[in-house]
Amino acid sequence: MASPHQEPKPGDLIEIFRLGYEHWALYIGDGYVIHLAPPSEYPGAGSSSVFSVLSNSAEVKRERLEDVVGGCCYRVNNSLDHEYQPRPVEVIISSAKEMVGQKMKYSIVSRNCEHFVTQLRYGKSRCKQVEKAKVEVGVATALGILVVAGCSFAIRRYQKKATA
């Protein structure tokens, strides 16, 4: 299901909303995308492709956007345009097409589908999903430390009162 307000143009990044994560592809025109697909990220994969995080390899594929999206929602998301100058569309598309069929190392943390398409569009590999997760883990860790410290303080205070 497409975003009703913006049709993709060649060179646009497409964010596809899967259950629990987003899959990313590069729109190359005429209804086609190029994307980095681990073995479980098959067209219309939906929630079953969440297991792609366990894979250590992936293939660059050229497929119809509607097939990759399946029943999921998607949108054009060039949100890094405000940070980086996109490469010329011709360079983005030709670079992507040259990679079709290649097998690549895959890592959910450092070499995933979002890293792949941002590298093509901007010449820089970025993944906001991973960056956001790192921040969330950091916040959760900090909160955990505060809770432990607070409990420790309360226990010591209670022990002092009990022995006084």
Swiss-Prot record:
Catalyzed chemical reaction(s): a 1,2-diacyl-sn-glycero-3-phosphocholine + H2O = a 1-acyl-sn-glycero-3-phosphocholine + a fatty acid + H(+); a 1,2-diacyl-sn-glycero-3-phosphocholine + H2O = a 2-acyl-sn-glycero-3-phosphocholine + a fatty acid + H(+); 1,2-dihexadecanoyl-sn-glycero-3-phosphocholine + H2O = 1-hexadecanoyl-sn-glycero-3-phosphocholine + hexadecanoate + H(+); 1,2-dihexadecanoyl-sn-glycero-3-phosphocholine + H2O = 2-hexadecanoyl-sn-glycero-3-phosphocholine + hexadecanoate + H(+)
Primary localisation category: membrane
Pfam families per UniProt: LRAT
UniProt-annotated catalytic positions: H23, H35, C113 (acyl-thioester intermediate)
GO molecular function terms listed in the Swiss-Prot or TrEMBL record: acyltransferase activity; N-acyltransferase activity; phospholipase A1 activity; phospholipase A2 activity
Positions on the Cytoplasmic side per record topology: 1-134
Record-annotated membrane-spanning stretches: 135-155
InterPro entries (alphabetical): H-rev107_PLA/AT, LRAT_dom
Tissue: Widely expressed.
Annotated spans, Interaction with TGM1: 124-164
Subcellular location as annotated: Membrane
Lumenal side: 156-164
UniProt KW Glycoprotein keyword: no
Domain LRAT: 13-129
Gene Ontology CC terms: cytoplasm; cytosol; membrane
Keywords assigned: Hydrolase, Lipid degradation, Lipid metabolism, Membrane, Transferase, Transmembrane, Transmembrane helix
pH dependence remark: Optimum pH is 8.
Secretion signal span: none
Biological process, per Gene Ontology: lipid catabolic process; N-acylphosphatidylethanolamine metabolic process; negative regulation of cell population proliferation; phosphatidylethanolamine acyl-chain remodeling; phospholipid metabolic process; positive regulation of keratinocyte differentiation; positive regulation of protein-glutamine gamma-glutamyltransferase activity
EC number(s) recorded for this UniProt protein: 2.3.1.-, 3.1.1.32, 3.1.1.4
Subunit: Interacts with TGM1.
Similarity-based family: Belongs to the H-rev107 family.
Function field: Exhibits both phospholipase A1/2 and acyltransferase activities. Shows phospholipase A1 (PLA1) and A2 (PLA2), catalyzing the calcium-independent release of fatty acids from the sn-1 or sn-2 position of glycerophospholipids. For most substrates, PLA1 activity is much higher than PLA2 activity. Shows O-acyltransferase activity, catalyzing the transfer of a fatty acyl group from glycerophospholipid to the hydroxyl group of lysophospholipid.
Name of the protein described by the UniProt record: Phospholipase A and acyltransferase 4
